Amino acid sequence: MVLEMEMSKTYQYRKVMKPMLERKRRARINKCLDELKDIMVECLTQEGEHITRLEKADILELTVEHMKKLRAQKQLRLSSVTGGVSPSADPKLSIAESFRAGYVHAANEVSKTLAAVPGVSVDLGTQLMSHLGHRLNYLQVVVPSLPIGVPLQAPVEDQAMVTPPPSECDSLESGACSPAPSEASSTSGPMWRPW
């Protein structure tokens, strides 16, 4: 008798809760669809289209089309930035981009340190930061100048990418710059990176 009573309570609870949970679920779906509708109407109005009435299926279809357009635009921007080679297609390119990002971060840290350390000559700081800027410009020119479809390969003179040529090193007062040995550039191991 107790089991039947518990069963009936559980059954009654499910009987009451299931429709209530379903109503809540549908309310959430409808709320999200209304938000999507507002967003899509705003986007389409900006594109010059006028929408009077949208059904739920229309909202979902327009959203899918809009997301596909956004993804295509993003890929187009990425291919124009990387010279037509997608970063996922060529892992060496993403390594070069990662190297540049690390270089920029390191240059920013040098700049902060120069500003924070008292007694550092302004001329020395200016010269060092302009040298780092010139090297960054060199790094940005190396990869995008490749023709589309040509695989990115390490140049014959790897040391030009790693260290500045000796003529530029001579202009620095510190004299701490020296060309990398040719054996280091020909090793098959991975290049050390500061990040």
Curated annotation (Swiss-Prot):
One Pfam family in the UniProt entry: HLH
Occurrences of domain bHLH (ranges): 13-70
Keyword presence, DNA-binding: yes
GO BP term (any one): positive regulation of neuroblast proliferation
GO annotation, cellular component aspect: nucleus
Domain commentary: Has a particular type of basic domain (presence of a helix-interrupting proline) that binds to the N-box (CACNAG), rather than the canonical E-box (CANNTG).
Protein name: Enhancer of split mbeta protein
Organism: Drosophila melanogaster
